[in-house]
Design a protein with these regions (language model features):
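PLD/PLD-like phosphodiesterase catalytic module centered on the HKD motif
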Residues: 1-172
Length: 172
C-alpha cells in the first residue's frame, strides 16, 4: 500500500473514469473544513453550505460525463450528532448527482467489511481512509491488490443492498 497526500487524493477523486463508491463506517468524523459548520448547526445557526459548492461542481462534472458516484453510510441509531448534521447537509450533493444511502448498523452485522472506510475507484484502485479515535483523518493509502479490490467491491455491494436511499431514510 502507498500513502498519498491530500492533494493526490483530491486528484484521484477528480480523475476516475467510470465509477466511484465510498463506504463510511464511523459514527463521527471531523475535518478542519467540517467542524466549524457542524458547530454552527449545533448552535442552531444558518449555514448557506457555500463551502460544499466545489465538491458539488465536481460531482456535476462526473454525472455530466456519465460517471456514477455512490456513497453508503453505515450508521448507529439513534444517529450521532455528526450523522444528524451530515443528514441535514446531504441534499446539495444529492442534487449534484451523488447517490447517498443510509444503512442502520444492525442491518450489516453479518457482512464482512474492511477495517477502514474506503473509496473504490473504477473497480481498480482502493483508497483506504485512516482516522484517529476522534474522527480526524490521519492517512490515506492506496491499493491495487486484487484481494483488496475484491474485498471492497463485495463489501460495498452487500452493504448497498441493505441501504436506504436518502429521500426514504427516516433518521432515528
Amino acid at each position: 500500500m502507498t500513502s498519498i497526500s491530500d492533494d493526490e487524493f483530491d486528484q484521484l477523486l477528480t480523475d476516475f473514469e467510470r465509477t466511484a463508491v465510498h463506504l463510511e463506517t464511523r459514527d463521527a468524523y471531523g475535518t478542519t473544513v467540517e467542524l466549524p459548520h457542524m458547530a454552527q448547526w449545533a448552535a442552531g445557526e444558518h449555514d448557506d453550505l457555500e463551502w460544499l459548492q466545489g465538491w458539488c461542481a465536481t460531482l456535476r462534472n462526473h454525472i455530466d460525463a456519465g460517471r456514477t458516484v455512490r456513497r453508503a453510510r453505515i450508521v448507529s441509531e439513534p444517529l450521532s450528532n455528526y450523522q444528524q448534521w451530515s443528514y441535514s447537509i446531504a441534499q446539495p450533493m444529492i442534487d449534484a448527482g451523488e447517490d447517498i444511502r443510509w444503512v442502520p448498523r444492525r442491518r450489516v452485522s453479518s457482512i464482512a467489511i474492511p477495517g477502514n472506510d474506503f473509496y473504490l475507484l473504477d473497480n481498480a484502485l482502493v483508497v483506504f481512509l485512516h482516522y484517529s479515535g476522534d474522527g480526524l483523518g490521519v492517512a490515506k493509502v492506496t491499493s491495487t491488490d486484487p484481494h483488496d479490490i475484491q474485498l471492497c467491491r463485495t463489501a460495498f455491494e452487500a452493504v448497498w443492498q441493505q441501504a436506504i436511499p436518502h429521500r426514504e431514510y427516516q433518521p432515528v
